[in-house]
């Protein structure tokens, strides 16, 4: 008798695109150099993120990511993705997983790259930011 088998649907990695003003941005490390090179024109090496000024360019990137096995979310309302830390707190790990970052008088404010990064930041002592959007 043959053992029962079933197809396991491989879980696709999801990338969150954020609308920041006129830009759409996301942060993701790609093992696939071919995919990274295809998106290289949109990579901001100073901020370690991909930026799209035009909807057409963003949509082309979305198609490329889908073909490469990624899902995506488009986020315009940043609520729930922004965390804050006191100015004196260690923040390197949180910064690493953020898409954008601002310093205020007594705190550092981060837009995290996805909800998993938000949860990790909360575990490291950050709190959800409830103020007006700074990004």
Place the predicted regions along the sequence by residue:
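Accessory DNA-engaging acidic/polar modules
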Residues: 1-135
